Amino acid sequence: MVIGSGVFLTRTCYLRLQPPSLVLRRRFCAATTACSVPLNGNKKKKSEKEKVIVISGPTGAGKSRLAMELAKRLNGEIISADSVQVYKGLDVGSAKPSDSDRKVVPHHLIDILHPSQDYSVGQFYDDGRQATKDILNRGRVPIVTGGTGLYLRWFMYGKPDVPKPSPEVIAEAHDMLVGFQTEYNWDAAVELVVNAGDPKASSLPRNDWYRLRRSLEILKSTGSPPSSFRIPYDSFRVNLVAPDADDFLEDGSSADISIQNIETDLDYDFLCFFLSSPRVALYRSIDFRCEDMLSGPNGVLSEARWLLDLGLLPNSNPATRAIGYRQAMEYLLQCRRYEGESSPREFYAFLNKFQTASRNFAKRQMTWFRCEPMYHWLNASKPLDSILQCIYDAYESEAEMVEIPESLRMSKDVRDSREASELKGYRSKNRHFVRREDCSSVLEWIRSEGCKSEASCVESAIA
C-alpha cells in the first residue's frame, strides 16, 4: 500500500524499545524543531492538552473493530489513516467499515477521492489535522485508526516545511514528465530527475509518478532535493539516540523508555496503541482474510476489473499499487490475454501472491512500529472488552504514566523458540480454496464477467 505502501522496511532501530515495565515516562527536555505542528511554548501539562487516541496495527489485527467499539464508548469519531480507504470504489480490498457502521459512528477521510487521483502523506496531514480540530470542537473524541505508518508519523510530529511550488513550477514539472509517463518510460524519467539534482529519485518505488513529480517541483522551487529538508520526526528521534545514563542497565539494556522531549512539545496528548497478535496466528488470519476478499461476486477481483476498465494499469498510481488490487489487476490482465480463460493452477498462484504480499506487508508494519516509541503494544488475541477497558482507563486517567496490564502486553519481537520455529516453517492453509474445484465459480465469473467492462456502472454508483 502504499499499500503500495506508505509503510516501508526500517532496517535500523535507534533504541531498544522493549523495557520490562512498558511504562511510558513523561519527562521534560527543552529542544526545538522545524516543524509544522504547533508547538506549545508554555509547555502545557498533560491535563491541559486535548487528547487524541491513535490505534494502529498490522493488516488483519482487528484495529477497525476496536476503534468502532471504543468510539461508541467514548462518544468518538474515527479518522481513517489508511492510504487506500480514501478511494471511492475500493471497498473490499481496503476493508472499509460498512455503511451501517458509518451511520452509527462518523468516519472521516473515507471515499474522498477517485482512484485515478493521487493522495500524499502531506495531504493526509492537512486533512487529518482539520478533522481532529472539527471533532474536538464538537466535544467528541478523535480516534485515528489505520496501519499506514508514515501517515501517523506525520500526523503526530508534523510535516517538513518545504516551500509550496508555484503554479508555474507545477506546470513545468508536469510538462517535463508527462511524455515519459504516457510512454510508461519510468527509467528515463528517473534519470531526468537524478540529473536535475535528486540522486535519491532512483530509489523511489517504480511508477510512483506523484513522488517523482513532487521531487522535480521541489528542485525547481528551491534548488535543493527533498532530502535536504529536515523532517520533524528526525528532530525528536535525535533526542532518543542519547538517553540519560540511568535509562540503561549495566548490561546495556533499556530499563525504561525515555521520551524526553516528544510529549512535551507535541500539541496534543496522543495516546497511542499498536494492536497485534502472535505472528503465526496473525499470518493465518491474513491468509483467511485474503480468501474472503475473493469469495462472492463483488470482491477484490470485481473492483480490480473496474480499475482496469478505467484505463489504469497495475502499479501505476497509489490506488493500483495497493496490495490485493495490484495482484488482482495483474491476474485479470493475464486472463484477458487468453479471452477470459484461467486454470485453477493460475488462480492459486495469484492467491498465493496476494497472501504472501499481505503477510510481508504486516511484517513491514511491525518492523516500522517497533521503532516508534510512543506506542503501547496490545495483544489482539486477548478479550476485546479487556482491551477496550485498558484504553478507556488510559483516556480517563490524568496520571503521568500509562501502564499496560501484564495480561494485555504484546511483545515487539518473536522471543519464543517454538513460535520462531513455526514461523520458519509457515505454510498457507486455505479454508475456502482447497481443492481445484473450489475456485470453479471464480473462474466462471472471469470467463463470463471478468473481461467485460462495467466502468460506467461503477462510476455512476460512486458519483
UniProtKB/Swiss-Prot annotation:
Disruption phenotype: No visible phenotype, due the redundancy with IPT2. Often chlorotic. GO terms for cellular component: cytoplasm. It is an enzyme of class 2 (transferase). Expressed ubiquitously, with highest expression in proliferating tissues. Pfam families: IPPT (PF01715). Its cofactor is Mg(2+). Catalyzes the transfer of a dimethylallyl group onto the adenine at position 37 in tRNAs that read codons beginning with uridine, leading to the formation of N6-(dimethylallyl)adenosine (i(6)A). Involved in the cis-type cytokinin biosynthesis. This is tRNA dimethylallyltransferase 9. It comes from Arabidopsis thaliana (Mouse-ear cress). The lineage of its organism: Eukaryota, Viridiplantae, Streptophyta, Embryophyta, Tracheophyta.
